[in-house]
């Protein structure tokens, strides 16, 4: 007598789990990663079609995990348990990267900082602004996440200076995301950075970097700021 359909599905789930424990995710395709997650949230059904549909709908594994709950619920087969698991998975990864950042020299290990920022704001469809407040040893004291951007006047240089003073920061890194994926800074980005840098210097606080963040990259605009400072003729239009 052959195996029932339910037994075949359970056998596939077991093999998928065993394969992961043998070789982690290196040999897994993106849909298999999602399938592995889904088997812990959705019992007794074949979740492979759901995993593949998620990739079709959102385009990549990262975009699936960055999707809002209501967007995920729009995919047939996705329910509160699976959406909650996806959110938990991403939040745990973000917490892990935050601990990595808190234990490092943030100016010497910019790769960890970039990983943290890409996880935190890189996939957001709305603009977010993040100041990272550092002590004199380049360790993270605190950070904040502001909704909106410098272009929308949601964040002001004076507000960030006040936060630096309140937490006793000696140095500051700022970052904001570009949901469009374009890394080029706007004129407002440049004006904001130069104003903030000037205000901080008067208080002996160093603005060490301003990063534009997308899902895949972090790009520093500080070399451009330094160019403006060295070449006054570049100031036209600011």
What are these regions (language model features)?
Residues 1-72:
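Long, highly charged, low-complexity intrinsically disordered interaction regions
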Residues 122-125:
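Short loop/turn motifs at secondary-structure junctions and domain boundaries
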Residues 129-133, 138, 209-212:
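Short beta-strand scaffold segments in enzyme catalytic cores
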Residues 139-148:
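Glycine-rich active-site/cofactor-binding loop and its immediate structural neighborhood
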Residues 151, 194-238:
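Divalent-metal-activated hydrolytic enzyme cores
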Residues 97-113:
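Long, charged amphipathic helices and adjacent flexible linkers at domain junctions
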Residues 149-188:
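Short HxH-centered metal-ligating active-site micro-motif
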């Amino acid at each position: 007598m052959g195996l029932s359909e339910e037994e075949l599905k359970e056998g596939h789930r077991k093999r998928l789990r065993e394969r992961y424990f043998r070789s982690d995710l290196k040999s897994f395709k993106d849909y298999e990663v999602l399938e592995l997650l889904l088997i812990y949230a959705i019992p007794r059904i074949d979740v492979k079609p759901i995993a593949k549909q998620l990739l079709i709908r959102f385009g990549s594994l990262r975009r699936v995990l960055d999707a809002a709950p209501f967007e995920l619920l729009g995919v047939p087969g996705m329910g509160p348990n699976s959406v909650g698991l996806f959110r938990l998975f991403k939040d745990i990864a973000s917490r892990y990267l935050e601990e990595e950042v808190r234990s490092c020299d943030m100016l010497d290990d910019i790769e960890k900082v970039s990983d943290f920022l890409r996880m935190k704001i890189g996939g957001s469809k709305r603009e977010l602004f993040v100041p990272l407040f550092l002590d004199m040893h380049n360790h993270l004291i605190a950070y904040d996440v502001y909704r909106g951007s410098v272009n929308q006047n949601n964040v002001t240089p004076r507000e960030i200076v006040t936060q630096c003073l309140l937490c006793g920061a000696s140095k500051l890194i700022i970052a904001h995301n570009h949901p469009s994926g374009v890394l080029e800074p706007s004129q407002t980005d440049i004006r904001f950075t130069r104003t903030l840098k000037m205000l901080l210097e008067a208080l002996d606080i160093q603005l060490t970097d301003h990063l534009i963040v997308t899902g895949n990259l972090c790009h520093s605009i500080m070399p451009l700021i330094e160019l403006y400072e060295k070449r006054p003729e570049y100031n036209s239009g600011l």
